[in-house]
Design a protein with these regions (language model features):
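Long, position-biased, composition-driven segments near the start of the mature protein
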Residues: 1-373
Length: 373
């Protein structure tokens, strides 16, 4: 913090003056947080009926008609075939179920098998999903970035790509996207386990009887990026949350402790005393204490090597030749091709990154001879 009113949640961030920010302050909750519904931090309305969750994670109202329809779809005609089990769910079980939902088409079955000590067979399903990778079309291609591909002519496979910091930032930005935003970009068709069914379930549940509000429904279907997480050359349109302003307080005692609280209409009413002044959050990607968005994750100017499996490393002549040696690819078999990456290619890269280990080859479709020529 300094006289220009900035703060950061990250260590070693630099102020406008060029010095590292080193004054510590305690972050407090907003004073009007008590006005929120206590104990109701979820998305569903309290007192709603029970829900029915199928093995492929379709969430439905717990109605008899839905239950009978599910049994009919599963070709279960005799109720004597069914038995009930009670399961205790803790943090470990939740992590297992999350992983199963991303990799398996039957995550509840896999989850129960794992609980019973069975081996993990989900990698087979992941490979099957990668084989069915299709292409996603974008609505516009307003921006493009160049990418040089190094291709094995005999294998019709991308060995690696040579890129600038813009393409590296694009790939790294995939790690910042909320899962709901990824599914929205892909039209709810990610092929990723059963999360498409979860996404569709939220779409189908009404705010009249089940979800608390349209705002919360939209939060699930189209969540925003955290403040300052968007890149300057963003090809995919995921909205970024705005960063709130904060208010600085001092306890006025000899030890002079500082406190920070989100700025609200009631922030000046505090047991800490009157607020000393507003503060704005620093963009952690800025080296000069800027509070506006933008910027990237990697330093430039720089060149990067991106493998077919999306491993990003610093490019050098030695590293590229060594990589070709590891792949046992003769230099005479290597061809170069410059391609353009726009919104459509970025969407397909995002999808391939989720389900394929040959993302560059899959996206740039080397069966198209125009790429190989």
């Amino acid at each position: 913090m300094d006289g220009r009113g900035i703060l950061s949640e990250f260590a070693n961030v630099r102020c406008h003056c060029g010095q590292v920010m080193n004054q510590l302050a305690t972050m407090l909750e907003p004073v009007d947080a008590a006005s929120c519904d206590q104990g109701e931090g979820g998305f569903l309305k309290g007192g709603a009926d029970r829900f029915l969750v199928s093995d492929d994670l379709r969430v439905m109202p717990g109605l008899s008609s839905q239950c009978l329809m599910l049994l009919k779809n599963l070709s279960i005609m005799d109720a004597k075939e069914l038995e009930s089990q009670s399961m205790n769910i803790g943090p470990e079980e939740i992590l297992q179920l999350l992983r199963s939902s991303l990799l398996s088409k039957t995550p509840l079955t896999h989850w129960i098998w794992l609980k019973q000590g069975a081996s993990d067979l989900m990698e087979l399903e992941l490979n099957n999903m990668a084989e069915s990778l299709d292409k996603t079309s974008a609505t516009s291609d307003s921006k493009k970035m160049s990418l040089k591909l190094f291709i094995s002519k005999s294998r019709e496979q991308v060995l690696y790509a040579e890129s600038g910091e813009d393409f590296a930032d694009l790939l790294f930005s995939f790690l910042t996207f909320p899962l709901g935003s990824i599914l929205k970009l892909l039209g709810g068709k990610s092929l990723l386990g059963c999360v498409d069914n979860l996404y569709g379930s939220v779409k189908d549940l009404s705010t009249d009887n089940y979800l608390k509000s349209d705002e919360l429904k939209n939060m699930l279907l189209c969540p925003k990026l955290a403040p300052f997480f968007a890149c300057e050359n963003q090809l995919l349109h995921v909205e970024e949350s705005s960063s709130p302003q904060y208010l600085l307080y001092s306890n006025g005692k000899p030890n002079n402790k500082w406190f920070v609280r989100p700025l609200t209409t009631e922030s000046n009413v505090s047991s800490l005393g009157e607020g000393l002044g507003p503060l704005s959050m620093v963009n952690p990607k800025s080296s000069t204490g800027e509070t506006t968005g933008g910027g990237g994750y990697v330093k430039g100017p720089a060149k990067f090597m991106v493998t077919d499996a999306l491993v990003v490393t610093q490019l050098s002549p030695i590293s590229s030749i060594s990589f070709l040696g590891k792949l046992d690819v003769p230099i005479t078999d290597v061809d170069e091709k410059v391609v353009q990456v726009g919104e459509e290619e970025a969407l397909n890269l995002l999808k391939a990154a989720l389900i394929s280990e040959t993302a560059l080859t899959d996206v740039f479709n080397l069966t198209d001879k125009s790429v190989l020529e």
